[in-house]
Amino acid sequence: MKSLQKGFTLIELMIVVAIIGILAAFAIPAYNDYIARSQAAEGVSLADGLKVRIAENLQDGECKGPDADPQSGVVGNEDIGKYALAKIEGDYDASKTDAGAPNGCKVEITYGQGTAEGKISKLITGKKLVLDQLVNGSFIAGDGTDLADKFMPNAVKAKK
């Protein structure tokens, strides 16, 4: 009398393991890109916070204001996040009046200099995103940016 087969054969198990390996080969790089994109987006959030400081400084005709001084309550020209450090740079150009033209003020975002050093994606560590502020107050990626285009937030990509 024949006995009934119970369980899976070795070949069936090997096929399942091979399929999982193939799926992981596609999923892991995509997941790493997703993590890098989400961490890169923090830099733009920091830059948005610096818009108010730039607007205040522009009242005095400058992009940068005084350096931070906790004693007097001056907040300074930079903001630090979990994954990035954002600094106000540039020289204001009052001659620019077209809403879509850069006004000379920039925010330089350096990834890997935040409070979570070592916990940032290696794909963006040490990269810079330089945002030029336009006359209308919005930002666009400018010269000096070495952050890969696939990690750059859509809000600041140059229209082509």
Swiss-Prot record:
Q: Name one Pfam family in it.
A: Pilin
Cellular location(s): Fimbrium; Membrane
What's its membrane topology? Single-pass membrane protein
Keyword flag Membrane: yes
Q: Where are the transmembrane segments?
A: 8-28
Q: Which GO terms describe its biological process?
A: cell adhesion
Q: Which residues carry this modification: N-methylphenylalanine?
A: 8
Extract the InterPro entries matched here: N_methyl_site, Pilin, Pilin-like
Q: Which Gene3D superfamilies match?
A: Glycoprotein, Type 4 Pilin
Q: Could you name the Gene Ontology cellular component terms for this entry?
A: membrane; pilus
> Is Cytoplasm included in the keywords of this UniProt record?
no
- What superkingdom does the record give? Bacteria
> Which cysteines share a disulfide bond?
63-105
The alphabetized UniProt keywords are:
Disulfide bond, Fimbrium, Membrane, Methylation, Transmembrane, Transmembrane helix
Q: Which residues form the propeptide?
A: 1-7
Quaternary organization: The pili are polar flexible filaments of about 5.4 nanometers diameter and 2.5 micrometers average length; they consist of only a single polypeptide chain arranged in a helical configuration of five subunits per turn in the assembled pilus.
Q: What does this protein do?
A: Major component of the type IV fimbriae that plays an essential role in twitching motility, natural transformation, and protease secretion.
Regarding protein family, the annotation reads: Belongs to the N-Me-Phe pilin family.
The name under which this protein is listed is Type IV major fimbrial protein FimA
